[in-house]
Amino acid sequence: MIRRRLLLTAALLCCLTTPPLHADERPHTAQPNVHVLAPMHMFGLDRERVVRVYLPPSYESTSKRYPVLYMHDGQNLFDDATSFIGEWGVDEMMNELARTQQLEVIVVGIDHGDEKRMTELNPWDNDKVGKGEGRDYLRFVVGIVKPYVDAHYRTLPDRAHTAMLGSSLGGLISHFAMYEYGDVFSRIGIFSPAYWIAPEVREFTRAHALAPGARVWFYAGSMEDSEMVANMDAIVEIMRAQRASAPALRVEVTPGAVHNEQAWRAEFPHAVEWLFEDAR
């Protein structure tokens, strides 16, 4: 068990933070409606971060306003050339959802911090990884990124039209955000959450209540770390027991799926369609 956990830690460090070999030789695959913003300063962390914005197909030809989905690990979302082992293809999938389901959402991808990823996306300290910086990271998302996006793009800025989704450590920080910033985010996607690195998450979940009207999509693959599905199920049961604030929950486990972008890419369109089904 300990060996498997160490291997997963190594995978989180290498697979999601180390630049791939010959990345500069791969063609850029981001669609024309993905825009890369100038780096933004992260107050409290004294770093800068690139933010990527996907705009729906109708954005330039209409005056309508759109819901917004905030995602982590922006390098892996839109462009094969900036990803580690392949992009999610969020831009292509959102274009297809707009065409076939009339679902149009602005997607904001916040790049991860490379070697800082394991602390930036964890709200709690960890003896092996370091001091948790997740609270500062979320203050950056809510206090800097979201106001900029709302000021420069035609968004629907209210809680009912604002979502967050992430995988692995991105799933962990999205879980934390739905409680700490329940007045900002009402729709949360939690893919393959790294609950194992933050055992405090269970007591945190028991001690907090979600704001009314939350929608939460949980996902894991059956062939991930042996504790992945069990940890996720334990969190789901805690949330379901909170009758007064029980959110709309959807839990999906894909047989044979592992901890990688390919699995998350396959799950993404189903999660997004469900999360926004009552907000079009």
Regions found by a protein language model. Name each.
Residues 24-280:
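Non-catalytic cap/lid and distal C-terminal segments of serine-dependent acyl enzymes
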Residues 1-2, 46:
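Short alpha-helical segments used as structural interaction elements across diverse proteins
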Residues 3-12:
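N-terminal export leaders
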Residues 19-23:
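Sec/Tat signal peptide C-region and signal peptidase I cleavage site
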